[in-house]
A protein has these predicted regions:
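AlphaC helix of the protein kinase catalytic domain
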Residues: 79-87
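Helix-rich C-terminal or lid/interface subdomains of diverse kinases
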Residues: 186-252
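ATP-binding glycine-rich loop module of kinase domains
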Residues: 4-37, 44
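Internal "kinase-insert"/substrate-recognition segments embedded within catalytic cores
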Residues: 88-116
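An alpha-helical support segment within catalytic cores of ATP-dependent transferases
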Residues: 106-153, 157, 163, 243, ...
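Pre-DFG segment of protein kinase catalytic domains
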Residues: 168-171
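Conserved HxN/HPN-centered segment at the entrance to the catalytic loop
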Residues: 47-59
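Conserved short submotifs of the Hanks-type protein kinase catalytic core
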Residues: 64-78
Length: 252
């Protein structure tokens, strides 16, 4: 397979459109097989929920010694691109994202990993915060309600593709079963990290209005989801995450 038409170039993967397929190539030839299989298995387990807005997984192959996952190609533009092209429609696009999040959270899958387990492990393994703060976060996480709703785990305008064939949600690597409000808090955080604070606040307002959810309850998840992201982010983003952890009131 000859790779062409680079769609995105991330830290660990490159995504290509090739022969009508989406080809996600892991840059490191030594990428553990378990990592590749985990992404593919998680994606297929979400497919099994019957959600119709997820590109179909096709196969895992090796290209030039590197693992690659091949998916159905979702043609169109990302919601992020549409927002840049027509800022006047920002609220309309944010509402579309809210509706997608509600659709996803209305589903369940007992096969995907548990969100609270993941958050617990992520926070417990941190060395960037002191033990007192870590204890506060883990205690607070323990007290938060445990649900089994499908959570995308990384819903953002860049992961939503809009085209003539419909709307598709991509990048399901971080999908978990858990509390929908934690999933919304992660989306809010994604928007803030992308320097879209105004959009983040509007998104939260629209979500709460549509779902009849208290914004304060969603904000209670923010220090938890922020802490879980610390080890993955760049130094400038870590400063913002630490601010969320330190400034958000944790009601034990």
């Amino acid at each position: 397979m000859k790779l062409k038409n680079l769609i995105s170039d991330g830290e660990k993967v490159q995504v290509f459109e090739c022969e009508g397929k989406c080809v996600k190539v892991f840059k490191d030839p030594k990428e553990p097989k378990s990592v590749v299989l985990y992404e593919a298995i998680t994606h297929t387990r979400v497919e099994e929920t019957g959600y119709g807005k997820i590109p179909e997984f096709e196969e895992i192959v090796k290209i030039d010694g590197k693992y690659a996952i091949i998916y159905q190609y979702a043609e169109g533009k990302t919601l992020a691109a549409l927002m840049r092209e027509d800022p006047a429609k920002r609220d309309e696009y944010l509402q579309q994202m809210v509706d997608l999040q509600l659709e996803i959270n209305s589903l369940s899958s007992a096969k995907v990993s548990r969100l609270k387990d993941y958050l617990n492990r992520s926070i417990d393994g941190l060395d960037m915060i002191d033990d007192v703060k870590k204890y506060e976060l883990l205690t607070h996480l323990n007290k938060m309600p445990t649900h089994s709703k499908l959570c995308h785990g990384d819903l953002a305008p860049d992961n939503i593709i809009v085209g003539s064939g419909g709307v598709f949600v991509v990048d399901w690597l971080k999908a978990k079963q858990g509390n929908a409000s934690a999933d919304v808090a992660k989306t809010y955080l994604n928007l803030c990290l992308d320097h879209r604070t105004e959009s983040a606040e509007k998104y939260l307002k629209l979500y709460c209005e549509r779902s009849n959810t208290d914004a304060g309850y969603i904000r209670e998840w923010l220090p938890i989801v922020a802490a879980a992201q610390l080890k993955f982010k760049k130094p400038d983003q870590r400063e913002l995450l630490l601010a969320f952890i330190d400034m958000t009131d944790i009601r034990n």
